[in-house]
Amino acid sequence: NKALPFVTDEKLKEDVRGFIKQEAMHARGHSSATEEYLAARGIKTERNQKLMKWLFDVVLDDKPFGKKMPALLERRWLLARLGLVATIEHMTCVLGMYALENKKWDEINADQVMLDLIRWHGAEEVEHRSVAFDLYKHLGGDYLSRYYLAAIVVPMIIGLWVDGAANIAGQDPRFANKKPAVYKPWMWVEWFKASRKQLLPNPLWLVLQQLPYFSPWYDPAKEGSTELAQAYLDQSPAAMAAGAIAANMKVAA
Protein backbone atom coordinates (compact mmCIF):
# COMPACT_ATOMS: atom_id res chain seq x y z
CA ASN A 1 0.00 0.00 0.00
CA LYS A 2 2.79 2.44 0.85
CA ALA A 3 4.39 1.89 -2.54
CA LEU A 4 1.25 2.44 -4.64
CA PRO A 5 1.52 6.27 -4.82
CA PHE A 6 4.97 5.92 -6.40
CA VAL A 7 3.88 3.51 -9.15
CA THR A 8 3.58 5.15 -12.57
CA ASP A 9 2.79 2.02 -14.59
CA GLU A 10 -0.98 1.41 -14.54
CA LYS A 11 -0.74 -2.32 -15.22
CA LEU A 12 1.75 -2.78 -12.40
CA LYS A 13 -0.45 -0.70 -10.11
CA GLU A 14 -3.40 -2.98 -10.86
CA ASP A 15 -1.21 -6.06 -10.30
CA VAL A 16 -0.13 -4.69 -6.92
CA ARG A 17 -3.75 -4.08 -5.90
CA GLY A 18 -4.61 -7.66 -6.90
CA PHE A 19 -1.61 -8.95 -4.95
CA ILE A 20 -2.73 -7.10 -1.81
CA LYS A 21 -6.26 -8.51 -2.12
CA GLN A 22 -4.97 -12.07 -2.61
CA GLU A 23 -2.72 -11.87 0.43
CA ALA A 24 -5.57 -10.51 2.55
CA MET A 25 -7.80 -13.39 1.42
CA HIS A 26 -5.03 -15.88 2.24
CA ALA A 27 -4.66 -14.41 5.71
CA ARG A 28 -8.38 -14.82 6.37
CA GLY A 29 -8.41 -18.33 4.95
CA HIS A 30 -5.48 -19.46 7.05
CA SER A 31 -6.61 -17.78 10.24
CA SER A 32 -9.98 -19.52 10.06
CA ALA A 33 -9.32 -22.96 8.53
CA THR A 34 -5.84 -23.61 9.90
CA GLU A 35 -6.55 -22.34 13.40
CA GLU A 36 -9.76 -24.37 13.61
CA TYR A 37 -7.99 -27.48 12.32
CA LEU A 38 -5.12 -27.17 14.79
CA ALA A 39 -7.31 -26.06 17.70
CA ALA A 40 -9.43 -29.19 17.27
CA ARG A 41 -6.24 -31.16 17.83
CA GLY A 42 -5.13 -29.18 20.87
CA ILE A 43 -2.50 -27.16 19.03
CA LYS A 44 -2.13 -23.47 19.91
CA THR A 45 -0.70 -21.02 17.37
CA GLU A 46 -0.77 -17.78 19.38
CA ARG A 47 2.99 -17.77 19.97
CA ASN A 48 3.77 -18.11 16.25
CA GLN A 49 1.22 -15.44 15.35
CA LYS A 50 2.63 -13.02 17.93
CA LEU A 51 6.12 -13.53 16.53
CA MET A 52 4.94 -12.76 12.99
CA LYS A 53 3.00 -9.73 14.18
CA TRP A 54 6.05 -8.41 16.01
CA LEU A 55 8.25 -8.96 12.97
CA PHE A 56 5.96 -7.20 10.49
CA ASP A 57 4.25 -4.63 12.72
CA VAL A 58 7.26 -3.60 14.81
CA VAL A 59 10.53 -4.48 13.10
CA LEU A 60 9.35 -3.85 9.52
CA ASP A 61 6.93 -1.03 10.27
CA ASP A 62 7.20 2.44 8.68
CA LYS A 63 8.63 3.37 12.08
CA PRO A 64 10.79 0.35 13.02
CA PHE A 65 10.69 -0.26 16.78
CA GLY A 66 8.61 2.91 17.02
CA LYS A 67 11.46 5.11 15.78
CA LYS A 68 10.69 7.63 13.05
CA MET A 69 12.80 7.01 9.97
CA PRO A 70 14.84 10.04 8.76
CA ALA A 71 13.24 11.55 5.66
CA LEU A 72 16.35 10.82 3.59
CA LEU A 73 16.07 7.10 4.40
CA GLU A 74 12.32 6.62 3.99
CA ARG A 75 12.56 5.65 0.31
CA ARG A 76 15.46 3.28 0.99
CA TRP A 77 13.54 1.66 3.85
CA LEU A 78 10.54 1.16 1.56
CA LEU A 79 12.77 -0.42 -1.09
CA ALA A 80 14.42 -2.66 1.50
CA ARG A 81 11.03 -3.98 2.59
CA LEU A 82 9.96 -4.50 -1.02
CA GLY A 83 13.20 -6.41 -1.61
CA LEU A 84 12.41 -8.56 1.40
CA VAL A 85 8.92 -9.30 0.09
CA ALA A 86 10.29 -10.07 -3.39
CA THR A 87 12.69 -12.60 -1.86
CA ILE A 88 9.91 -14.24 0.15
CA GLU A 89 7.69 -14.37 -2.95
CA HIS A 90 10.38 -16.32 -4.80
CA MET A 91 10.57 -18.74 -1.88
CA THR A 92 6.80 -19.18 -1.72
CA CYS A 93 6.66 -19.67 -5.49
CA VAL A 94 9.09 -22.57 -5.09
CA LEU A 95 6.94 -24.04 -2.33
CA GLY A 96 3.79 -23.39 -4.35
CA MET A 97 5.13 -25.44 -7.24
CA TYR A 98 6.13 -28.19 -4.82
CA ALA A 99 2.60 -28.29 -3.41
CA LEU A 100 1.02 -28.39 -6.87
CA GLU A 101 3.30 -31.17 -8.11
CA ASN A 102 3.47 -33.34 -4.98
CA LYS A 103 1.35 -36.46 -5.55
CA LYS A 104 2.44 -38.20 -2.36
CA TRP A 105 -0.01 -36.16 -0.27
CA ASP A 106 -2.86 -37.56 -2.37
CA GLU A 107 -1.51 -41.10 -2.10
CA ILE A 108 -1.54 -41.01 1.70
CA ASN A 109 -5.06 -39.50 1.76
CA ALA A 110 -4.06 -36.21 3.38
CA ASP A 111 -6.93 -34.09 4.71
CA GLN A 112 -8.60 -32.84 1.52
CA VAL A 113 -9.71 -29.48 2.92
CA MET A 114 -6.25 -28.62 4.22
CA LEU A 115 -4.63 -29.95 1.06
CA ASP A 116 -6.85 -27.74 -1.08
CA LEU A 117 -6.12 -24.73 1.13
CA ILE A 118 -2.37 -25.28 0.78
CA ARG A 119 -2.52 -25.80 -2.98
CA TRP A 120 -4.85 -22.83 -3.47
CA HIS A 121 -2.40 -20.65 -1.60
CA GLY A 122 0.52 -22.20 -3.48
CA ALA A 123 -1.13 -21.69 -6.87
CA GLU A 124 -1.73 -18.01 -6.16
CA GLU A 125 1.86 -17.60 -4.96
CA VAL A 126 2.98 -18.97 -8.32
CA GLU A 127 0.47 -16.81 -10.16
CA HIS A 128 1.62 -13.49 -8.63
CA ARG A 129 5.31 -14.40 -8.26
CA SER A 130 6.48 -11.43 -10.36
CA VAL A 131 4.56 -8.59 -8.70
CA ALA A 132 6.80 -7.74 -5.73
CA PHE A 133 9.95 -8.16 -7.84
CA ASP A 134 8.60 -5.95 -10.62
CA LEU A 135 7.56 -3.33 -8.07
CA TYR A 136 11.00 -3.41 -6.45
CA LYS A 137 12.68 -2.80 -9.81
CA HIS A 138 10.10 -0.20 -10.88
CA LEU A 139 10.88 1.92 -7.81
CA GLY A 140 14.62 1.77 -8.36
CA GLY A 141 15.70 -1.35 -6.48
CA ASP A 142 19.18 -2.41 -7.57
CA TYR A 143 20.82 -5.81 -7.90
CA LEU A 144 23.46 -5.38 -5.19
CA SER A 145 20.87 -4.47 -2.55
CA ARG A 146 18.68 -7.37 -3.69
CA TYR A 147 21.63 -9.76 -3.39
CA TYR A 148 22.53 -8.77 0.17
CA LEU A 149 18.89 -8.65 1.25
CA ALA A 150 18.33 -12.17 -0.07
CA ALA A 151 21.47 -13.40 1.70
CA ILE A 152 19.87 -12.29 4.97
CA VAL A 153 16.23 -13.10 4.23
CA VAL A 154 16.56 -16.67 2.89
CA PRO A 155 18.17 -18.20 6.01
CA MET A 156 15.99 -16.02 8.25
CA ILE A 157 12.75 -17.24 6.65
CA ILE A 158 13.83 -20.88 6.65
CA GLY A 159 14.75 -20.47 10.32
CA LEU A 160 11.34 -18.95 11.07
CA TRP A 161 9.57 -21.81 9.29
CA VAL A 162 11.50 -24.40 11.31
CA ASP A 163 10.96 -22.42 14.52
CA GLY A 164 7.20 -22.34 13.90
CA ALA A 165 7.13 -26.05 13.12
CA ALA A 166 9.14 -26.76 16.28
CA ASN A 167 6.63 -24.83 18.37
CA ILE A 168 3.77 -26.90 16.94
CA ALA A 169 5.68 -30.20 17.22
CA GLY A 170 6.47 -29.39 20.83
CA GLN A 171 2.76 -29.47 21.62
CA ASP A 172 2.45 -33.04 20.33
CA PRO A 173 2.66 -35.51 23.26
CA ARG A 174 4.68 -37.87 21.05
CA PHE A 175 7.53 -35.37 20.87
CA ALA A 176 7.27 -33.77 24.32
CA ASN A 177 10.49 -35.37 25.53
CA LYS A 178 12.37 -34.04 22.47
CA LYS A 179 11.64 -30.40 23.36
CA PRO A 180 11.77 -29.37 19.66
CA ALA A 181 13.59 -26.13 18.85
CA VAL A 182 15.08 -24.53 15.74
CA TYR A 183 18.60 -24.86 17.19
CA LYS A 184 18.26 -28.57 17.99
CA PRO A 185 19.43 -31.15 15.42
CA TRP A 186 16.32 -33.28 16.03
CA MET A 187 14.05 -30.86 14.15
CA TRP A 188 16.30 -30.78 11.11
CA VAL A 189 16.77 -34.55 11.13
CA GLU A 190 12.99 -35.02 11.22
CA TRP A 191 12.66 -32.62 8.28
CA PHE A 192 15.14 -34.72 6.29
CA LYS A 193 13.24 -37.89 7.21
CA ALA A 194 9.93 -36.37 6.08
CA SER A 195 11.50 -35.24 2.82
CA ARG A 196 12.71 -38.78 2.09
CA LYS A 197 9.09 -39.88 2.33
CA GLN A 198 8.16 -37.03 -0.07
CA LEU A 199 6.01 -35.40 2.60
CA LEU A 200 8.09 -32.20 2.65
CA PRO A 201 10.63 -30.64 0.29
CA ASN A 202 14.22 -31.63 1.00
CA PRO A 203 16.00 -28.82 2.93
CA LEU A 204 19.03 -28.88 0.63
CA TRP A 205 16.79 -28.85 -2.44
CA LEU A 206 14.89 -25.89 -1.00
CA VAL A 207 18.12 -23.95 -0.47
CA LEU A 208 19.34 -24.74 -3.99
CA GLN A 209 16.04 -23.46 -5.42
CA GLN A 210 16.90 -20.03 -4.03
CA LEU A 211 20.12 -19.72 -6.04
CA PRO A 212 18.49 -18.38 -9.24
CA TYR A 213 17.25 -15.38 -7.26
CA PHE A 214 20.86 -14.34 -6.60
CA SER A 215 21.57 -14.01 -10.32
CA PRO A 216 21.69 -10.51 -11.91
CA TRP A 217 19.56 -11.98 -14.72
CA TYR A 218 16.87 -13.41 -12.47
CA ASP A 219 13.43 -13.26 -14.06
CA PRO A 220 10.48 -14.50 -11.95
CA ALA A 221 8.46 -15.08 -15.12
CA LYS A 222 10.81 -18.00 -15.87
CA GLU A 223 10.19 -19.58 -12.47
CA GLY A 224 7.16 -21.76 -11.82
CA SER A 225 4.27 -22.44 -14.18
CA THR A 226 1.37 -20.02 -14.53
CA GLU A 227 -0.52 -22.63 -16.56
CA LEU A 228 -0.27 -25.24 -13.81
CA ALA A 229 -1.29 -22.70 -11.17
CA GLN A 230 -4.28 -21.50 -13.18
CA ALA A 231 -5.39 -25.05 -13.93
CA TYR A 232 -5.54 -25.76 -10.21
CA LEU A 233 -7.30 -22.50 -9.36
CA ASP A 234 -9.97 -23.29 -11.96
CA GLN A 235 -11.05 -26.40 -10.02
CA SER A 236 -10.07 -25.57 -6.42
CA PRO A 237 -13.04 -25.47 -3.98
CA ALA A 238 -11.15 -22.97 -1.79
CA ALA A 239 -10.36 -20.71 -4.75
CA MET A 240 -13.97 -20.81 -5.97
CA ALA A 241 -15.27 -20.04 -2.48
CA ALA A 242 -12.83 -17.13 -2.17
CA GLY A 243 -13.92 -15.86 -5.58
CA ALA A 244 -17.58 -15.98 -4.55
CA ILE A 245 -16.83 -14.07 -1.35
CA ALA A 246 -14.87 -11.45 -3.25
CA ALA A 247 -17.70 -11.06 -5.77
CA ASN A 248 -20.28 -10.64 -3.00
CA MET A 249 -18.10 -8.04 -1.28
CA LYS A 250 -17.78 -6.14 -4.55
CA VAL A 251 -21.55 -6.16 -5.08
CA ALA A 252 -22.16 -5.05 -1.49
CA ALA A 253 -19.70 -2.19 -1.91
Task: Annotate each PLM feature.
Residues 1-253:
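Non-heme di-metal
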